[in-house]
Amino acid sequence: MLHLRDHGLLELDAPTVTGRTIGENLAWWEQSERRRLFREKLTSLDGIDPDDVIRPPEKAFPSTVTFVQGNLVPEGAVVKSTAIAPELLDEDGIFLHEGPARVFVSEEAAIAALKSTGEDRVQEGDVLILAGLGPLGAGMPETYQVTSTLRYASVGKNLAVLTDARFSGVSTGPCLGHASPEALAGGPLGKLRDGDPVRIHIDTRKLVGTADFTGNLEEFLKRETHPGLEPDPRLPADTRLWAALQNASGGSWGGCVYDVEEIIKRL
């Protein structure tokens, strides 16, 4: 609140339940003994600079997320680019990975292949594709199990992940999620097959990137979707309804607000 005040973003004359204005409350808090003690404890007990907990704008972190586009994700995907290991970046902060697609239509199958020691195992240099895990396919689950497995798998740092599912804040590495359109909504991700050439380029400083199929694009776009793609039969009815409504309303870019007229038209 003090930072907001200092940047003129608060109505300091607004009354509060204390009987004082916001400005008066903040002036008291800024000089209060309680605040001073809290700041001292953080420094003396934990070795933490209080101004690193809630940072002022001049010390703000840069964005940690890169927006990626390309012929595999024409409506975009996102990656937590600050979670990519520094040794995977060049001197300009660029992550570049080119490799064959390894396509899975369920998280369970991907985990099994990551743990396998047989011929079906995921190889170093692969691009792990998790398709059909968006809202229509699986309710857009958090694919934590895959990223957790990657952390301990021998090939973990030497491959990339591209999916229409989502990731949590604990994801690490070049894991691109929210690929849009999702595979079951006709997205190109659903056309990929094992061995297809894929190129992922992420500029972690400019926060832009691309995810592309690098083979014959004309032939690729004519393909049927992956034969294994289908909605998860375990999806509850309310999740299926939500997925259908958000898809009718615009998917990734519009589905957060239902388009009532479009939904009625489709009904």
Task: Locate predicted features.
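Catalytic or ion-coupling anion/metal-binding cores of large enzyme and transporter domains
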Residues: 1-158, 163-183, 187-267
